[in-house]
Design a protein with these regions (language model features):
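Aromatic-capped, Gly/Pro-kinked transmembrane alpha-helices
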Residues: 378-393, 415-525
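Hydrophobic alpha-helical transmembrane segments
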Residues: 2-15, 125-133, 316-324, 391-408
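Hard-cation-handling environments
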Residues: 351-404
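Hydrophobic transmembrane alpha-helices and their helix-loop junctions in integral membrane proteins
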Residues: 21-32, 36-57, 67-354, 371
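Alpha-helical transmembrane segments
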Residues: 23, 334, 405-417, 519-523
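Alpha-helical transmembrane segments and their membrane-interface junctions
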Residues: 287-302, 363-382, 456-460
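Hydrophobic core of alpha-helical transmembrane segments in multi-pass integral membrane proteins
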Residues: 16-23, 99-102, 192, 362-367, ...
Length: 525
């Protein structure tokens, strides 16, 4: 079954557009495996978007998980291989939660139909499905796979990853769980959590990955508030975020492609060598920060306004705080330490033409949507009555940007990136996995070998071997003996009868005559 309405169409529109742009961005890549994985991944996202039942959704959901991991593995480094395995493990677990929820829901309702779920009718099945969706939406503490795997993906693979998995999760949450208040609270916390890590991170693509958690927080919060304006805001932000976040990943990827470096502490002073990439990266930075006349301005504030209209003052405060962190980490820190800052001595060439064309199209979309928001608003699931370009919204945005800029200048030395590792929730499952393996090898394995193994040997293995020996004797002596005896008897009599067949007519005549006399004798006497 399929589901085609304004909600699915707006996501399908941006997924298709971004797939085309990233394919253009990756034209220089001579790796058929990577391209195949990317196309399957994009196709899976569209399959989920148009799924009208949970069976179809689950099939394409798993297609996304198993195809996207190859975009990490194809970088072919030890870190990317390990990150890919962790990524796959987490998504397989999430898929099992989703599958369990789907099966349980079918048992409860007798239907696989995919549609809205009422907060009052929350059941075990709904809870399991929600966990599966939230994992793909990178809801803390289930978010570590994103900041772990995305920075280790290939240059072009990271751009694909930034566009699909998490935004598909936003779509299914908006479709099924709009109005769940717990999501509004979780989303606001996500928004702040992500920018905190983005502000202290050193790796450029990991900054963007952490900040993606923050932006997803806005979307999840909008879905949780559940009003028409809030859902419109979540969808609009998902659409624009795919555009400008993709542009930022393209810019950071181009720098990695041309310099071989992604850590801010290893970069700096390259603005004169890659001016076009610099322009495109700054465009993405100001757009994601919500500058007027950019895509971020006409989408992000819609969710904040929706929170204010529903009198969620604390949520609104957290979202505004996250906006400050966004401009600080991605709008200022990221471009400054990549392009300016101290001179790293690197003299890279400009990125290939196809990369520039893809970034140019995406940058154009950032400005086009900001200048002409009606293009996006007409695609949103509900009528839009909110106007971004009011004196209040403009003054609010400019004050936020101005004072954040002043703060960046004041605390510039404190924000200078250092080559260090930041501990996140992935530490627990990394350490937990090691502890589990140690427990399994040192305790469980010994118990299994010394105790369970002996029980298995005495109760199962030896009796089975004894029965097998008896069956073997029966098979060879009785079954095979009977069959072989019949065969041997036939061969013996065949040999005797063969002696009679001499080929001479007089012998046959004598035998026939003797036979005749024997028959007559038997009849008469």
């Amino acid at each position: 079954l399929g589901k085609v309405d304004k909600l699915s169409l707006v996501f399908a529109h941006i997924f298709t557009l971004m797939a085309f742009i990233v394919v253009l961005y990756s034209l220089h890549v001579k790796d058929d495996g990577q391209h195949t994985a990317a196309f399957l991944y994009a196709g899976g996202s569209l399959g989920v978007t148009f799924a009208g039942d949970y069976v179809t959704l689950y099939i394409f959901w798993e297609l996304m998980a198993f195809s996207s991991v190859f975009l990490v593995w194809h970088r072919r480094t030890k870190k990317s291989i390990n990150a890919g395995f962790r990524y796959l493990l987490v998504h397989v677990v999430g898929g099992l939660f989703l599958l369990g929820g789907i099966i349980t829901r079918y048992g409860e309702t007798g239907s696989f139909a995919f549609g809205p779920i009422s907060p009052e009718g929350m059941t075990l099945a709904s809870f399991l499905i929600l966990i599966g969706f939230c994992l793909n939406a990178a809801v803390p503490p289930l978010h570590a796979w994103l900041s772990d795997a995305y920075p280790e993906a290939t240059v072009t693979g990271a751009v694909f990853l930034s566009a699909f998995t998490t935004k598909v999760a936003v779509y299914v949450l908006a479709r099924a769980f709009a109005g769940f208040e717990i999501l509004a609270i979780i989303g606001a916390i996500m928004a702040v959590y992500g920018v905190c890590y983005a502000t202290i991170e050193n790796d450029s693509r990991r900054i963007l990955a952490y900040h993606m958690v923050s932006q997803l927080g806005y979307m999840v919060c909008g879905v949780g508030i559940g009003t028409e304006m809030a859902v419109n805001g979540a969808v609009a932000l998902a659409y624009t975020n795919i555009v400008y976040k993709g542009l930022l990943f393209m810019g950071a990827g181009a720098v990695l492609e041309m310099t071989g470096r992604s850590k801010l502490s290893d970069l700096g002073g390259i603005y004169k060598y890659m001016p076009l990439t610099l322009f495109f990266t700054i465009t993405g930075g100001i757009s994601i920060s919500g500058f007027p006349l950019t895509a971020g301005f006409i989408s992000k504030a819609m969710t904040v306004t929706a929170a204010a209209e529903e009198h969620h003052i604390f949520l609104m405060f957290l979202l505004m705080l996250a906006s400050i962190g966004t401009f600080l980490s991605v709008g200022l820190k990221l471009p400054y330490f990549i392009w300016f800052g101290r001179d790293s001595g690197i003299k890279p060439r400009e990125a290939p033409l196809n990369m520039h064309l893809a970034m140019a199209i995406t940058a154009f979309m950032c400005y086009f949507l900001g200048i002409y928001p009606k293009f996006l608003y007409d695609m949103l699931p509900y009528p839009v009555h909110w106007h971004p370009y009011t004196a209040f919204h403009l003054s609010e945005a400019m004050q936020l940007l101005l004072f954040t800029s002043i703060g960046f200048i004041i605390f510039l030395k404190k924000l200078t990136p250092e080559p260090k590792i930041n501990i996140d929730t992935d530490w627990f499952y990394r350490k937990g996995a090691r502890l589990f393996m140690g427990f399994a090898n040192n305790i469980i394995a010994k118990i299994e070998y010394n105790f369970i193994g002996e029980i298995y040997e005495f109760i199962i293995r030896k009796p089975i071997l004894g029965i097998a020996q008896i069956l073997k004797i029966f098979d060879t002596e009785v079954v095979d003996g009977t069959i072989n005896g019949v065969g041997n008897t036939t061969l013996t009599w065949g040999g005797i009868m063969r002696l009679i067949q001499t080929g001479q007519l007089q012998h046959y005549a004598i035998i026939m005559t003797l036979g005749f006399f024997v028959i007559v004798t038997l009849i008469l006497f």
